Each structure stands twice: as structure tokens, then as C-alpha cells.
Amino acid sequence: MDNRTTYCGLVTESYIGQEIILKGWVQKRRDLGGLIFIDLRDREGVVQIVFNPDFSKEALTIAETIRSEYVIEVHGKVTMRDEAVINPKIKTGKVEVQVSEVTIINKSETPPFQIEAETDSSEDVRLKYRYLDLRREPLANTFKMRHQITRAVRNYLDESGFYEVETPVLTKSTPEGARDYLVPSRVQEGEFYALPQSPQIFKQLLMIGGFDKYYQIVKCFRDEDLRADRQPEFTQIDIEMSFVDQEDVMSMNEGMLKRIMKDVKGIDIATPFPRMTYEEAMRDYGIDKPDTRFDMKLVTLNDLASKMEFKVFKGAVESGGAVKAIVVKGASDKYSRKDIDALQEYAKIYGAKGLAWVKVTEDGLNGPIAKFFEESHASELLDATNAEMGDLILFVADKWSVVNASLANLRNKLGKELGLIDENKYNFLWVTDWPLFEYDEELDRYFAAHHPFTAPKKEHVEMLKTDKEKVQANAYDVVLNGYELGGGSIRIHDQEMQKKMFEALGFSDEEAQEQFGFLMDAFKYGAPPHGGIALGLDRMVMLLSGRSNLRDVIAFPKTASATCLLTDAPSKVDDKQLEELHIQLNIENSEK
């Protein structure tokens, strides 16, 4: 029976004079010769408990055997600490518990690392012993916030008339984007299920089924290369609505995010959110998820570059590329040539061949390429960039994609390095008017920029066959502080329109029927117009909790190589299991 009075981290002055019962883990033990002090910890925090022979000699005797991470139960009286030993850094810092009775519930071996807020243990060790890592206060607080976010989501959507509906985890493999995780069928020999990359098709079928408003906090799976903000399995807040347009979905989503920020962070955010088209985002920031907490926009200088005799600039423009610049205000004295060389190496990570630069001084432009700027060119540069004396101007000339990627990431790096970002600011932003298609140069074909079920803008339907690169989607992404928080669209709900989309993507009628025939059939039976959005829950928790990567906000995450150090998954299985699944392994040159 849980007979606790309260949690350790909630014992404050309101309990003074009361006899209470606490249970938790021993964080620290200090023996002062006759008195023993223990910091007792649970998920809500720590409280100091005192073993004093004046209160209980028996409890003191037991306390002499207690060590770190023992699980104990204590009975005692809450008293005020002496003023000299008050700890203002913790909620319970003004009180302590004088123990009259203690029970050792379970002992602990010495843990492989110190279980404290700050630890110098490697991440691999902490992931191997994740259940110990989860005891640390920063992670405990993070998962408390995760719960608060999902509670706010459920409360808001329930009040707004949404049904929470579960969709299948074992489903059909379809060519939607990343590689699928496949699950072999024992019963249907040689056939496979796939774990869902998203519930996209099922939530559309729910709209056809008349559910009107659906949501789900759902696990999704993508077998793709990992990075700091990616995991092979992740959780998204999945939403779909019938009889809506883009404005309806965006407004609903703003209301939900406003509720989350108020309930979880105590912050009132302004709605509606600012909006920016995809074209504006790429023009001014070089990226489709701009961090608008600081300025330093990219400036396109193709007109100026075409007038100059600098071959690097002129050649980039003539070959259909671009010349863009960013202005680092007041940085001409802060960055030496060596510092700028380091920035150049960073830009090269994103494909740039080099990083040109000039400094604006009393005597005009100064730097390796200053000689290529005639007086009129220099004047035009300063007008275009609004650069002033003391500023540093950085240029990249290359293909549009390289220029944008290198300067966008360089801008973000400089924003952090120079302290231009207010870390307490939450800048939400909509990016709209997305291209419907993306072109893959290597494969020489178009792909859906979001997914094949996104509706094109009505006025662009006729261009599906003739000008794919100009077709815009009824799609919208919500961005927070330079991260894509979620994305959505108005869906195709007409069979003929969906056929046109598949055709534009290079599907034959047979391929479309094979992969998506069940959806096409559903469109025959009165599909309502519908749209929705999906937001990354893990990423939202990461951003609101100030954590640096997704592994910190998932209870049992995978490593960068998609392994679980705790359970050693993935692992080999018995030959008998493979035989039952009709699978033979063909692994060459594999070492594991």
C-alpha cells in the first residue's frame, strides 16, 4: 500500500510541524559523527532528512548502513532548517525531516555513474543504464513536461470536439518517402507488413468514414540516417479534420499551441502566427525553417555580380546560380583572417567551394576581393545589404541550393556564436505556399515535396503536366525557433485528382492501383474535403525543455546507429524463428 504523505520534492514550509511518511532513493549521505544527513529523492525532487539520536537511536543505527541509491521509507517530523543552512537553490531548501523511523526497502550496488543533475559520465554509459539516468532531476523534469504537453493536447482537442482514434501499427508498405521497417508475415508466406511512417492514409479513411475530427498521439517509424533531431521511432501529434480549408487547420493548430505554451510554460503567445511563403523563406533565410529570433537576412546580389569582373561571382550567375551575402554587424574587428577561414571550412560542409568576404572600413571595402568592387559596385553593395562601417560581409557564389544551404547554416552558427539569439524567446511561424514537387537530379524525376496526397492549389492543377516545378501545394509547416515543428496540408479528396497526382509522380495506373487501390476505391463513396497536420511531439518537448537532442526526451531512445544500448536491440534471432517466417539470411562481409 502506498502510504506516502507526499513526494520528497514537495515538502515545503506548509508541512512544518507535521508527521509525514516519505519514500525514495538516497541521493547523498553525510555522516557528521553522531548526526547523519541524507538527501532523499523521488521524481519531484529532493528533501533533506536528518537522523538524530535525540529523535531515534534505532533509526540512526540503521542509517549508518544506508548507502547511495538505497530505496528507503522514512517517518518523521518536518522542521525549519537553521537559517545558516537554508538552501535557496531547491524548493525544499528551508525545511528538513527529523526521522523517527526508517525502513530499508531495497539495497543498491554502487551505480556506474553519479546520479546527480550534472554528470560527466559518457552518453553511452548513461544509455546502457538508462533506468538510472532517468532518476536524474533534469530528465525527470523533462518527462514531467512531456506529460504536461500531451495532457494539454488531449484537453484542448477533446474540448474542440475531436475523437482520439488508434490506427494500425502493422500495415502495408507504400512508397511514401523514407525506407520502411518491414515485418515478415508467418501466416502469409513471403509477404510483409510495414510499420507506419505516419497514419496518413488511415486518418484520411477516417474522414471518409465520417469521423469529422480525429487525433492521435502516435508512434511512427522511419528507417533513415539519424542525426541529433531524428530517431527511428518517434511520436507525433496527428490531426485530421473534415470540411475545412487551410485557414481552419492553421487556426485550430495555433489555438492548441497557445494552450500548450500557457499550460506548460506559463507564456501567453500571440496569435495568429506570422506567415512567410516558402519562396520568401528561401530568399531571405536560405532555409524552409528559419529562426526569426535574430536578423541577418540573406541578400541576393545577382544583378551586382553580373556587372563585376570577378569571375567567381559572374560565373555563378551566368551558369544559372546565385551570389548571396550576409552582413555580420559590427564584426569586422571581431573576426581575424584565421576566424574567417574557420567560417569558410564550416560553409564547405554544406557544399560551398569557398567563402568570400570584405570588411567595411573608414577607407571603404577591405579584404581579398575588395579590389573587384569598383566605386559604383561598392556603393551598390552597401545599399543592397545596408552594411555600415565596422560590418563584415560574407559571400557565397554557387548553385542556388549550395548558396542557400551554406549561408543559412552559417547564419545560424553566427547567431549562436555572437549571442544574437534570445534563448527565452519562442518565435512561431507558418511557412506556406510550398512547391508540390521536388526534383531529384540524380534520379532525374520529381517526388512529392510532402506526400502524394497533398492537394495542389486549384489554379495550378493545369500545370501538373506542363510545369511541375511551378505547381504550389495547399501545404503549411509550423516552425519554432529554426525547427520544423510540424507540417500539414489540405488533402486530395477526388479520385480523378488523385490519379492525376500519381501520374505526375510517374506511377502507372497499375502501380497506383497496386499501392493505393484501397484509397482510390474509398474516394468513390463520397469523400469529404479534409485536411490536417502532424506535429513532432519529441521535437516539441526538446525545444520547450531546452534539451539539445531528441535522445534526452525519449524514455528509451536509440543511438545514432539505431541501436538500443540498454537491451542490445537489434539482435540476432534463432534459426527456428527465421524458419517459421520463411526467411534465409544472405549476409556477406558482415562483422557484428
Curated annotation (Swiss-Prot):
Binding-site positions, L-aspartate: 176, 222, 450, 491
An example Gene Ontology molecular-function term: aspartate-tRNA ligase activity
Reactions catalysed according to its record: tRNA(Asp) + L-aspartate + ATP = L-aspartyl-tRNA(Asp) + AMP + diphosphate
Residues bound to ATP: 222-224, 231, 484, 536-539
Domain of life: Bacteria
Keyword vocabulary terms for this entry: Aminoacyl-tRNA synthetase, ATP-binding, Cytoplasm, Ligase, Nucleotide-binding, Protein biosynthesis
Any one annotated GO CC term: cytoplasm
Keyword Nuclease: no
Gene3D superfamilies: Bira Bifunctional Protein, Domain 2, GAD-like domain, Nucleic acid-binding proteins
PROSITE patterns membership: AA_TRNA_LIGASE_II (PS50862)
Pfam families, per database record: GAD (PF02938), tRNA-synt_2 (PF00152), tRNA_anti-codon (PF01336)
Functional description taken from the UniProt entry: Catalyzes the attachment of L-aspartate to tRNA(Asp) in a two-step reaction: L-aspartate is first activated by ATP to form Asp-AMP and then transferred to the acceptor end of tRNA(Asp).
Name assigned to this protein: Aspartate--tRNA ligase
The species this protein was found in: Macrococcus caseolyticus (strain JCSC5402)
Gene behind the chain: aspS
